[in-house]
Amino acid sequence: MERSTPDSTPVLGDVFKENTAVAHINNDFSATENIANLVTTESVASEPPVLLADAGSASSPAPAKSVSAKAVRSILVPPSAHLKYDIKGEVKGFPYQVRGDLRWAQDGKTYDARMEISHFLLGSRVQTSTGQLTGHGLEPTRFGDKVRSEVAAHFDYEKNKVTFSANTPDAPLLSGAQDQLSVFMQLAAMIGAEPRGFPEGSTLPFQAVGPRSAESWVFTVGATEKLQMPGGDVSALRLWRDPSGEYDPKVEVWLAAEVGFLPVRIRLTQPNGDFVDQQWRETQK
Protein backbone atom coordinates (compact mmCIF):
# COMPACT_ATOMS: atom_id res chain seq x y z
CA MET A 1 0.00 0.00 0.00
CA GLU A 2 1.42 3.35 -1.06
CA ARG A 3 1.54 5.95 1.68
CA SER A 4 0.38 9.43 0.90
CA THR A 5 1.25 12.61 2.70
CA PRO A 6 -0.37 16.03 2.42
CA ASP A 7 1.70 18.73 0.80
CA SER A 8 1.04 21.13 3.62
CA THR A 9 -0.64 21.31 7.00
CA PRO A 10 -4.11 22.85 6.71
CA VAL A 11 -4.73 25.81 8.97
CA LEU A 12 -8.10 26.74 10.49
CA GLY A 13 -9.32 30.21 9.71
CA ASP A 14 -9.99 32.86 12.33
CA VAL A 15 -12.06 31.61 15.25
CA PHE A 16 -14.82 33.96 16.18
CA LYS A 17 -14.95 35.43 19.63
CA GLU A 18 -18.56 34.74 20.56
CA ASN A 19 -19.65 31.28 21.62
CA THR A 20 -23.41 31.51 21.94
CA ALA A 21 -26.33 29.99 20.10
CA VAL A 22 -28.10 32.30 17.67
CA ALA A 23 -31.85 32.00 17.12
CA HIS A 24 -33.56 33.08 13.89
CA ILE A 25 -37.12 32.99 12.66
CA ASN A 26 -37.25 31.27 9.29
CA ASN A 27 -39.97 31.78 6.70
CA ASP A 28 -38.58 29.54 3.99
CA PHE A 29 -35.70 27.11 3.44
CA SER A 30 -34.14 24.06 1.64
CA ALA A 31 -30.78 22.03 1.23
CA THR A 32 -28.20 18.58 1.60
CA GLU A 33 -24.95 16.13 1.08
CA ASN A 34 -21.86 14.58 2.89
CA ILE A 35 -18.88 14.69 5.17
CA ALA A 36 -18.26 11.11 4.23
CA ASN A 37 -15.47 11.62 1.76
CA LEU A 38 -13.11 13.04 4.37
CA VAL A 39 -11.13 9.89 5.04
CA THR A 40 -10.47 9.17 1.39
CA THR A 41 -6.86 9.50 0.27
CA GLU A 42 -5.12 8.09 -2.76
CA SER A 43 -3.72 5.34 -0.59
CA VAL A 44 -6.93 4.39 1.19
CA ALA A 45 -9.53 4.05 -1.62
CA SER A 46 -12.58 6.04 -2.39
CA GLU A 47 -14.98 7.62 0.02
CA PRO A 48 -14.88 5.42 3.10
CA PRO A 49 -17.39 5.95 5.98
CA VAL A 50 -17.03 7.07 9.67
CA LEU A 51 -18.19 5.61 13.24
CA LEU A 52 -19.59 2.75 15.41
CA ALA A 53 -21.71 2.44 18.53
CA ASP A 54 -24.41 0.28 20.07
CA ALA A 55 -27.73 2.03 19.76
CA GLY A 56 -31.31 1.26 20.67
CA SER A 57 -34.36 2.80 19.08
CA ALA A 58 -37.94 3.24 20.15
CA SER A 59 -41.40 4.31 19.02
CA SER A 60 -43.09 3.36 15.78
CA PRO A 61 -42.50 5.69 12.84
CA ALA A 62 -45.04 8.37 12.04
CA PRO A 63 -46.32 8.81 8.49
CA ALA A 64 -43.58 10.15 6.24
CA LYS A 65 -43.64 13.91 5.84
CA SER A 66 -41.36 16.08 3.75
CA VAL A 67 -40.16 19.21 5.56
CA SER A 68 -39.30 21.63 2.78
CA ALA A 69 -37.69 25.03 2.96
CA LYS A 70 -40.89 26.89 3.55
CA ALA A 71 -42.06 24.46 6.25
CA VAL A 72 -39.13 25.22 8.56
CA ARG A 73 -40.30 27.80 11.08
CA SER A 74 -37.17 28.62 13.08
CA ILE A 75 -33.41 28.17 13.27
CA LEU A 76 -31.11 27.91 16.31
CA VAL A 77 -27.51 28.03 15.15
CA PRO A 78 -25.32 25.93 17.50
CA PRO A 79 -22.70 27.73 19.59
CA SER A 80 -19.05 27.57 18.59
CA ALA A 81 -17.50 24.23 19.49
CA HIS A 82 -14.45 22.02 18.98
CA LEU A 83 -15.30 18.30 18.79
CA LYS A 84 -12.83 15.45 18.49
CA TYR A 85 -13.64 12.00 17.11
CA ASP A 86 -12.30 8.47 17.00
CA ILE A 87 -12.74 6.99 13.54
CA LYS A 88 -12.58 3.41 12.39
CA GLY A 89 -13.22 2.05 8.96
CA GLU A 90 -12.52 -0.61 6.40
CA VAL A 91 -11.50 -0.32 2.75
CA LYS A 92 -11.31 -3.45 0.58
CA GLY A 93 -10.87 -5.55 3.71
CA PHE A 94 -8.18 -3.27 5.12
CA PRO A 95 -9.17 -1.93 8.58
CA TYR A 96 -7.86 1.40 9.77
CA GLN A 97 -8.23 3.85 12.65
CA VAL A 98 -7.77 7.60 12.41
CA ARG A 99 -8.69 10.75 14.32
CA GLY A 100 -11.20 13.43 13.41
CA ASP A 101 -11.46 17.07 14.43
CA LEU A 102 -14.43 19.39 13.90
CA ARG A 103 -14.00 23.11 14.57
CA TRP A 104 -17.20 25.11 14.34
CA ALA A 105 -17.15 28.87 14.93
CA GLN A 106 -19.84 31.51 14.55
CA ASP A 107 -20.28 35.12 15.66
CA GLY A 108 -23.97 35.57 14.90
CA LYS A 109 -23.32 36.95 11.42
CA THR A 110 -20.76 34.64 9.82
CA TYR A 111 -19.53 31.10 10.35
CA ASP A 112 -16.40 29.02 9.78
CA ALA A 113 -16.43 25.21 9.84
CA ARG A 114 -13.46 22.87 9.44
CA MET A 115 -13.38 19.07 9.56
CA GLU A 116 -10.05 17.26 9.43
CA ILE A 117 -9.43 13.53 9.35
CA SER A 118 -5.79 12.60 9.82
CA HIS A 119 -3.37 9.70 10.25
CA PHE A 120 0.38 9.91 10.81
CA LEU A 121 1.04 7.57 7.86
CA LEU A 122 -1.86 8.31 5.53
CA GLY A 123 -1.77 12.08 5.82
CA SER A 124 -4.92 14.17 6.20
CA ARG A 125 -8.07 15.29 4.47
CA VAL A 126 -9.64 18.64 5.29
CA GLN A 127 -13.02 20.06 4.36
CA THR A 128 -13.86 23.69 5.09
CA SER A 129 -17.00 25.78 4.78
CA THR A 130 -17.37 29.53 5.27
CA GLY A 131 -20.38 31.75 4.86
CA GLN A 132 -23.08 33.95 6.34
CA LEU A 133 -25.76 33.32 8.96
CA THR A 134 -29.24 34.40 7.90
CA GLY A 135 -32.83 33.93 9.01
CA HIS A 136 -32.76 30.68 7.04
CA GLY A 137 -29.64 29.38 8.78
CA LEU A 138 -26.31 28.82 7.04
CA GLU A 139 -25.62 30.44 3.68
CA PRO A 140 -22.29 29.06 2.41
CA THR A 141 -20.03 31.20 0.25
CA ARG A 142 -17.12 28.78 -0.18
CA PHE A 143 -16.52 25.05 0.28
CA GLY A 144 -13.03 23.56 0.13
CA ASP A 145 -11.82 19.95 0.02
CA LYS A 146 -8.09 19.26 0.40
CA VAL A 147 -6.00 16.10 0.34
CA ARG A 148 -2.78 17.18 -1.37
CA SER A 149 -4.14 20.16 -3.26
CA GLU A 150 -7.45 21.88 -2.65
CA VAL A 151 -10.50 21.95 -4.89
CA ALA A 152 -13.27 24.38 -4.05
CA ALA A 153 -16.83 25.42 -4.82
CA HIS A 154 -17.91 29.07 -4.80
CA PHE A 155 -21.51 30.17 -4.22
CA ASP A 156 -22.59 33.14 -6.37
CA TYR A 157 -25.93 34.33 -5.01
CA GLU A 158 -26.19 37.26 -7.44
CA LYS A 159 -25.96 34.99 -10.48
CA ASN A 160 -27.64 32.01 -8.75
CA LYS A 161 -24.89 29.58 -9.65
CA VAL A 162 -22.08 27.53 -8.13
CA THR A 163 -18.65 27.56 -9.76
CA PHE A 164 -15.92 24.99 -9.23
CA SER A 165 -12.14 25.38 -9.24
CA ALA A 166 -11.86 21.88 -10.74
CA ASN A 167 -13.20 23.32 -14.02
CA THR A 168 -16.31 21.16 -13.90
CA PRO A 169 -19.52 22.72 -15.26
CA ASP A 170 -21.27 25.39 -13.18
CA ALA A 171 -24.34 24.27 -11.26
CA PRO A 172 -27.56 26.22 -10.62
CA LEU A 173 -27.70 27.51 -7.04
CA LEU A 174 -31.01 26.62 -5.40
CA SER A 175 -32.61 28.35 -2.45
CA GLY A 176 -31.29 27.02 0.86
CA ALA A 177 -28.33 25.19 -0.72
CA GLN A 178 -25.66 23.76 1.57
CA ASP A 179 -22.29 22.15 1.01
CA GLN A 180 -21.08 18.72 2.11
CA LEU A 181 -19.92 20.10 5.47
CA SER A 182 -22.37 22.91 6.24
CA VAL A 183 -25.33 20.58 5.77
CA PHE A 184 -24.58 18.96 9.14
CA MET A 185 -24.54 22.33 10.92
CA GLN A 186 -27.75 23.31 9.13
CA LEU A 187 -29.38 20.10 10.36
CA ALA A 188 -28.15 20.98 13.86
CA ALA A 189 -29.69 24.45 13.57
CA MET A 190 -33.03 23.07 12.37
CA ILE A 191 -33.30 20.26 14.92
CA GLY A 192 -31.94 22.45 17.73
CA ALA A 193 -34.69 25.02 17.18
CA GLU A 194 -37.46 22.41 17.23
CA PRO A 195 -36.21 19.13 18.73
CA ARG A 196 -39.72 17.68 18.60
CA GLY A 197 -40.73 19.37 15.39
CA PHE A 198 -39.59 16.62 13.03
CA PRO A 199 -41.63 13.42 13.49
CA GLU A 200 -40.01 10.08 12.78
CA GLY A 201 -40.30 9.44 9.07
CA SER A 202 -40.09 13.13 8.10
CA THR A 203 -37.78 13.92 5.20
CA LEU A 204 -35.45 16.90 4.88
CA PRO A 205 -34.43 17.70 1.28
CA PHE A 206 -31.31 19.70 0.45
CA GLN A 207 -29.20 20.73 -2.48
CA ALA A 208 -25.72 19.63 -1.40
CA VAL A 209 -22.68 21.09 -3.11
CA GLY A 210 -19.44 19.14 -3.27
CA PRO A 211 -16.04 20.19 -4.63
CA ARG A 212 -16.96 19.28 -8.22
CA SER A 213 -20.76 19.11 -8.47
CA ALA A 214 -24.10 19.73 -6.77
CA GLU A 215 -26.54 16.97 -5.91
CA SER A 216 -29.92 16.47 -4.29
CA TRP A 217 -29.83 14.91 -0.82
CA VAL A 218 -32.82 13.81 1.23
CA PHE A 219 -32.40 12.94 4.91
CA THR A 220 -35.00 10.82 6.70
CA VAL A 221 -35.62 11.46 10.40
CA GLY A 222 -35.36 8.38 12.59
CA ALA A 223 -35.70 7.71 16.31
CA THR A 224 -33.70 9.03 19.25
CA GLU A 225 -31.13 6.39 20.21
CA LYS A 226 -28.82 5.83 23.15
CA LEU A 227 -25.21 5.65 21.94
CA GLN A 228 -22.10 4.44 23.71
CA MET A 229 -19.48 6.84 22.39
CA PRO A 230 -15.80 7.05 23.37
CA GLY A 231 -16.75 10.35 25.04
CA GLY A 232 -19.57 8.77 27.07
CA ASP A 233 -23.19 7.71 26.71
CA VAL A 234 -25.42 10.14 24.82
CA SER A 235 -28.95 10.27 23.45
CA ALA A 236 -28.96 11.32 19.81
CA LEU A 237 -31.45 11.69 16.98
CA ARG A 238 -30.61 9.50 14.00
CA LEU A 239 -31.06 10.72 10.44
CA TRP A 240 -29.97 8.97 7.28
CA ARG A 241 -29.64 9.48 3.57
CA ASP A 242 -30.16 6.43 1.35
CA PRO A 243 -27.98 6.05 -1.76
CA SER A 244 -29.44 7.74 -4.82
CA GLY A 245 -27.09 6.05 -7.27
CA GLU A 246 -25.33 2.75 -7.80
CA TYR A 247 -22.07 3.96 -6.26
CA ASP A 248 -23.44 6.34 -3.63
CA PRO A 249 -22.78 5.63 0.07
CA LYS A 250 -25.49 5.44 2.70
CA VAL A 251 -24.98 8.34 5.11
CA GLU A 252 -26.14 8.16 8.73
CA VAL A 253 -25.75 10.97 11.25
CA TRP A 254 -26.65 11.22 14.95
CA LEU A 255 -27.28 14.67 16.45
CA ALA A 256 -27.09 15.17 20.23
CA ALA A 257 -28.40 18.04 22.35
CA GLU A 258 -25.36 17.62 24.62
CA VAL A 259 -23.16 19.20 21.92
CA GLY A 260 -25.66 21.66 20.45
CA PHE A 261 -27.06 19.02 18.08
CA LEU A 262 -23.74 18.84 16.25
CA PRO A 263 -22.90 15.30 15.04
CA VAL A 264 -21.76 12.83 17.69
CA ARG A 265 -21.61 10.07 15.11
CA ILE A 266 -21.40 9.86 11.34
CA ARG A 267 -21.35 6.55 9.51
CA LEU A 268 -20.84 6.12 5.77
CA THR A 269 -21.37 2.74 4.15
CA GLN A 270 -20.36 2.02 0.57
CA PRO A 271 -22.30 -0.42 -1.64
CA ASN A 272 -19.34 -2.86 -1.49
CA GLY A 273 -19.39 -2.89 2.34
CA ASP A 274 -16.52 -0.45 2.91
CA PHE A 275 -17.36 1.93 5.73
CA VAL A 276 -16.22 4.86 7.84
CA ASP A 277 -17.58 5.17 11.38
CA GLN A 278 -16.86 8.41 13.25
CA GLN A 279 -17.61 8.68 16.98
CA TRP A 280 -17.46 11.65 19.34
CA ARG A 281 -14.55 11.38 21.79
CA GLU A 282 -14.51 14.76 23.53
CA THR A 283 -15.52 18.38 23.34
CA GLN A 284 -12.65 20.80 23.89
CA LYS A 285 -13.28 24.15 25.53
Language-model regions: role of each:
Residues M1-K159, P199-K285:
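Acidic, serine/threonine-rich low-complexity disordered tracts
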Residues K161-Q186:
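Acidic/charged, solvent-exposed loop-and-adjacent secondary-structure segments enriched in E/D, K/R, S/T
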